[in-house]
Amino acid sequence: MSKPYFPVESLYRMPWTMPDNGITWLEPTSQCNLSCYGCYRKNIKNSHKTMEQVKQELDFFQSQRKSDCISIAGGDPLVYPHIIELVKEIKSRGMKPIINTNGIALTKELLHELKKAGVFGFTFHIDSKQGRGREEKWRNKNEVELNELRLYYAEMLASEGGIACSFNSTVYGDTLQYVPELVAWAQKHIDIVDTMVFILFRYITPNTPFNFYVGDQKIVWTDIHYHSDQEEVVDLKSPMIVEKIRERFPDFTPSAFLNGTHKADDYKWLLSERIGNKDKIFGYTGKKFMELVMSVYHYKYDKYLSYASPKTLAMGRSTMFVLSLFDKGVRKALKNYLKYLVVNPFRIFKKAHLQSILIIQPPDLMANGDQSMCDGCPDITYWKDKDGTEKLVWSCRLEEPMKYGDFLRMVPKREEGTEKGKDKVLHYSYGNNSD
């Protein structure tokens, strides 16, 4: 019997479920000012939804699901003409507006207006596979060289003040090597970078051993948006990222996770929370810290925490002193911190911060054609089918109902039947959404 990579008792299973979650995903537009390899969403010009449509989606979300924040995504939400009004709307509903963007359209003036509207934070997606749209100076830069661009946005948010700052990066087979450097860069800027997210690359490739169907109709695999005509590494797993990070940070320790829908030891969302400053990481919180934070926050606000404010994350020192009573990881961090002070007591004037490192492992293809999704998916979004039925669906697979009217199913090529109709191959175009 194979053993899980992490002992089951070492991690806190995040309590997020379909009706009670930390995050919900809103897409006001599918238009983007970048064309990125690896993106899950088709770039559709002039696809902006009206504010009435967006409000309807928010109404449906709130009728079905508790959320601490709304991730405003796309497309790129900063090209959405009503973005300031949308941020105000989300804020007025008692949720935290988080903008997921590539940052190209962000100016200091727009940032200031968004802060006045109530924006809580930004998650910037920056990686070396992003295509046309950025300035020429960023072309052909590797992940480490792009830290200069990341720092530009982190400092912009820090200058405005009071806005959470996160970065996403897709991890490919040839960029895995850079992950430890990005984690080290995040520590260097732990005072202004709150979260680093690593999303493992997933695409359909020529050797994918499945055929694809909607109903009984076979779909040409090259018609599916998220496909590559060349072979790629599409089976990276969260433990592989942990092993790579530990080459630079041997004590790196996750404390919480979301499992897969088909496998309990698929670490779909794997979260590490570390405490430190620019000089040193003192330690990593344990599962009891995560359980306590989630339980207390839910007791107080009747929803689970997603993003914390920069002010809260700057309380690393008080976190160590207070919560060391309850959590082994925090207790170890406190011991290391006290040793750090003994060497030079004046170090007490340096703030300690909390910083999150999150690894996301998208859908995995099972041998029978099933897909193991994130159990309690945080990035659930809205879909209205051709019959007008509103649904909560996976944002990472939204292209399927958008194009085909339903989610695709996969049949292993070696098991495929020979019935009539399965030889009929259809090409689909977009436009099935009743909206």
What residue ranges belong to the model's regions?
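Conserved, mostly hydrophobic/aromatic
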Residues: C32, I99, E390
